[in-house]
Amino acid sequence: FAPQIIKNCMISIDGLAVEFGGTALFSDISFVINEKDRIALMGKNGAGKSTLLKILAGARQPTRGKVSAPKDCVVAYLPQHLMTEDGRTVFGETAQAFSHLHEMEAQIEKLNKELETRTDYESDSYMALIEEVSSLSEKFYSIDATNYEEDVEKALLGLGFTRGDFQRQTSDFSGGWRMRIELAKLLLQKPDVLLLDEPTNHLDIESIQWLEDFLINNGKAVIVISHDRKFVDNITT
């Protein structure tokens, strides 16, 4: 869940170029990603779509050009090939999407305990600590974390899992099903910009329809690579 804090997460792409051994994969690509934009990258295999997505995710550097985004802009990336970690249940692994909330809560508790032991009420450091607790608490309570288990359940059911699957180990599932777990985690984090590389590859029709509805109603920017023309048409129009 993203904090309900108003911010402008516009990303500017300026003059991107990627070359391999003097051969240009693409050059002089410039565009802007605005809040709530839903953009599809389409083209033949080898055109550089996945490479562009990796650059936007910060996973690789271009030969030339730059990507500019606000510091607090959260970008999440689902690559085409990815494996989930073993050692957790399907539900437990998906709930890792909210692990930052537990860390935030622990930090607030730690700072509050420190405040209780301080007596230098007029000092700059005390005021700075008060400000830090206030800011962190505001951010934490602006996130509706109370129903996160319900949201995990909805995402897993939407992506084709059954309730009987929730307590099974992730290692019981094939790569395609494990990719669904990673997709669920990414969606539940509600980043400002979602980068999805062929997200429908391992999904059935019902799960694709659920994903379409989620992306349309999510209200966040999405950039997707997909050969599924119907999916692209549905989410970008």
Task: Indicate residue ranges for each PLM-predicted region.
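ABC ATP-binding cassette signature C-motif
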Residues: P3-T237
